[in-house]
């Protein structure tokens, strides 16, 4: 297990991936909540089955996997659906992150989280990355091919700076 855990937090489109990529290039192991969330939602996983049961088969793409843009549109327009999804997936995400931390062979590990949620008692240091709101909106629109209205809806659900 890594001896020193550096937490990295920031809102959507603030540059967490760019920062974690720099650390990874320096040999630091990365435990990323976004990657863990994708892992726990793969076909065959318990969360996958519950998401499909709850949202219906229309939530699947042509390959039979969760259509993340479609799911994102639902959960960021209906707060109760976001709560449902978080309650369902967060325990599995935390478990996946802890496994990655414990398997780490580097002296350091970077724990990449979104904004303000998660266990800070695991971290020896916390880095926060931020960006101007208009930069966040532009980055996410380009990356995810979604509207500014959709990005603003996501930002609105995240804790204030």
Tell me what each language-model feature is.
Residues 1-35:
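Walker A (P-loop) phosphate-binding motif
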Residues 5, 20, 48, 52, ...:
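A general structural signal for well-ordered alpha-helical segments in protein cores
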Residues 18-21, 29-42, 57, 142, ...:
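N-terminal polybasic phosphate/anion-binding patch
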Residues 26, 55, 121-122:
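Short, structured coil segments at secondary-structure junctions
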Residues 35-105:
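ATP-dependent small-molecule kinase phosphotransfer cores
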Residues 84, 125-161:
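A glycine- and Lys/Arg-enriched "phosphate-lid" helix/loop adjacent to the NTP-binding pocket
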Residues 91-95, 107-114, 149-157:
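Short gly/ser/thr-rich secondary-structure transition/capping motifs
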Residues 96-102, 108-142:
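ATP-dependent NMP and nucleoside kinases share a basic, alpha-helical "lid"
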């Amino acid at each position: 297990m890594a001896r020193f855990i550096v937490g990295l937090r920031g809102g959507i489109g603030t540059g967490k991936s760019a920062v974690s990529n720099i650390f990874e290039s320096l040999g630091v192991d990365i435990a990323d909540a976004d990657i863990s969330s994708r892992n726990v939602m793969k076909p065959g996983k318990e969360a996958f089955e519950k998401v499909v049961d709850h949202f219906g088969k229309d939530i699947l793409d042509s390959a039979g996997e969760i259509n993340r843009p479609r799911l994102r549109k639902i959960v960021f327009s209906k707060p109760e659906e976001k709560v449902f999804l978080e309650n369902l997936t967060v325990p599995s995400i935390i478990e996946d992150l802890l496994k990655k931390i414990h398997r780490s062979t580097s002296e350091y590990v970077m724990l990449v989280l979104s904004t303000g949620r998660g266990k800070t008692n695991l971290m020896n240091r916390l880095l926060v990355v931020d960006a101007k709101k208009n930069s966040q909106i532009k980055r996410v629109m380009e990356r995810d091919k979604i509207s500014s209205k959709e990005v603003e809806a996501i930002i609105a659900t995240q804790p204030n700076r």
